[in-house]
């Protein structure tokens, strides 16, 4: 499991995927999110701007990312 430490109150879903190097660009993040390949807390979420907070878990392409404060 990868961990993203929040510097602010939240991080957006597309930014989290880019920060972990799971996508190369914002355009790629938008595509994989809108196509339903990303889960947030166990459910598919198609909003690139979805705000992730402490305790949220993202799953994409075999990688799990935990958001921590």
Predicted features along the sequence, with ranges:
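A detector for short, charged/polar N-terminal pre-domain segments
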Residues: 1-11
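Short, charged beta-turn/beta-strand-edge "cap" motif at the junction between a beta-strand
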Residues: 44, 62-67
């Amino acid at each position: 499991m990868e961990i993203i430490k929040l510097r602010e109150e939240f991080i957006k879903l597309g930014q989290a995927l880019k920060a972990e190097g799971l996508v190369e660009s914002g355009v790629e993040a938008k595509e994989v999110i809108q196509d339903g390949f990303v889960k947030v807390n166990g459910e598919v979420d198609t909003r690139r701007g979805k705000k992730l907070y402490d305790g949220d878990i993202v799953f994409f392409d075999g990688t799990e990312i935990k958001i921590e404060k």
